[in-house]
Amino acid sequence: MRHSPRKRFGQNFLQDKYIINEILRAINPLADDNMLEIGPGLGALTQPLLQKLNQLTAIEIDTDLQSYLTCLPASQGKLNLIPADALTVDFCQFGPHLRVVGNLPYNISTPLLIYLLKFITCIDDMHFMLQKEVVERIAAAHGTKAYGRLSVMLQYHCEVEYLFDVPPEAFEPRPKVDSAIVRLTPYRVSPFESVNTEKLENIVAKAFAMRRKTLTNNLKGIISLSQLNDLGIDGGKRPEQISVAEYVQLAKFISN
């Protein structure tokens, strides 16, 4: 099929067979898995997944691609295609133990990752191809330049594994940036205290609103320097120097 990639959907189609096989190896799909693919595109990953699975659900927003995907020989009787924007879908409707995969459009990858956290109790694992810079941010340790809101929110909910890089020449058209594969596995037993996710997201967003300012400055009116000291958190530090566990402490304090 000749399909002109659409800029508004951030489309870059994976074509490199070696990379596709490496992604499949990382996912390790089993026949009875409850698997969902976001943005299947031209089916580079969809078709080999269908060969291994009894059933695959896929969410595709592009109407041209929806028609193409339903006509693939491998899709017959096995592909459950949802014509929708992934940012509007209730992922828990597909049942428990959901395994989510996808080459996420770079223009919506961050909001989509944050959105998926709402359905984390229904998800067993997630394997995504993302812009390399986004994967670096997700996996970043506190105290590093890449560490930010996305790092805290995803590391609070999931074990993060940076798997491997994908060069631009693996795609058509070639993106101007490198890509990478990440595995996100929601904790069954969390290493962190349980807190209100909305409160955590709010405190993290405020803390990182101005990265060059101190935590005390960014959280002015929410928590005082003396209260930070009582929690054992250095208010003179910048937001990227505060660990996930410390942000959890802050969210718990605000909730109380």
UniProtKB/Swiss-Prot annotation:
<protein>
    <recommendedName>
        <fullName>Ribosomal RNA small subunit methyltransferase A</fullName>
        <ecNumber>2.1.1.182</ecNumber>
    </recommendedName>
</protein>
<dbReference type="GO" id="GO:0005829">
    <property type="term" value="C:cytosol"/>
</dbReference>
<dbReference type="GO" id="GO:0052908">
    <property type="term" value="F:16S rRNA (adenine(1518)-N(6)/adenine(1519)-N(6))-dimethyltransferase activity"/>
</dbReference>
<dbReference type="InterPro" id="IPR029063">
    <property type="entry name" value="SAM-dependent_MTases_sf"/>
</dbReference>
<dbReference type="InterPro" id="IPR023165">
    <property type="entry name" value="rRNA_Ade_diMease-like_C"/>
</dbReference>
<dbReference type="Pfam" id="PF00398">
    <property type="entry name" value="RrnaAD"/>
</dbReference>
<dbReference type="GO" id="GO:0003723">
    <property type="term" value="F:RNA binding"/>
</dbReference>
<comment type="similarity">
    <text>Belongs to the class I-like SAM-binding methyltransferase superfamily. rRNA adenine N(6)-methyltransferase family. RsmA subfamily.</text>
</comment>
<feature type="binding site">
    <location>
        <position position="103"/>
    </location>
    <ligand>
        <name>S-adenosyl-L-methionine</name>
    </ligand>
</feature>
<feature type="binding site">
    <location>
        <position position="60"/>
    </location>
    <ligand>
        <name>S-adenosyl-L-methionine</name>
    </ligand>
</feature>
<keyword id="KW-0808">Transferase</keyword>
<keyword id="KW-0694">RNA-binding</keyword>
<keyword id="KW-0963">Cytoplasm</keyword>
<dbReference type="InterPro" id="IPR011530">
    <property type="entry name" value="rRNA_adenine_dimethylase"/>
</dbReference>
<dbReference type="InterPro" id="IPR001737">
    <property type="entry name" value="KsgA/Erm"/>
</dbReference>
<keyword id="KW-0698">rRNA processing</keyword>
<dbReference type="InterPro" id="IPR020596">
    <property type="entry name" value="rRNA_Ade_Mease_Trfase_CS"/>
</dbReference>
<feature type="binding site">
    <location>
        <position position="85"/>
    </location>
    <ligand>
        <name>S-adenosyl-L-methionine</name>
    </ligand>
</feature>
<keyword id="KW-0949">S-adenosyl-L-methionine</keyword>
<feature type="binding site">
    <location>
        <position position="14"/>
    </location>
    <ligand>
        <name>S-adenosyl-L-methionine</name>
    </ligand>
</feature>
<feature type="binding site">
    <location>
        <position position="12"/>
    </location>
    <ligand>
        <name>S-adenosyl-L-methionine</name>
    </ligand>
</feature>
<keyword id="KW-0489">Methyltransferase</keyword>
<feature type="binding site">
    <location>
        <position position="39"/>
    </location>
    <ligand>
        <name>S-adenosyl-L-methionine</name>
    </ligand>
</feature>
<comment type="function">
    <text>Specifically dimethylates two adjacent adenosines (A1518 and A1519) in the loop of a conserved hairpin near the 3'-end of 16S rRNA in the 30S particle. May play a critical role in biogenesis of 30S subunits.</text>
</comment>
<dbReference type="InterPro" id="IPR020598">
    <property type="entry name" value="rRNA_Ade_methylase_Trfase_N"/>
</dbReference>
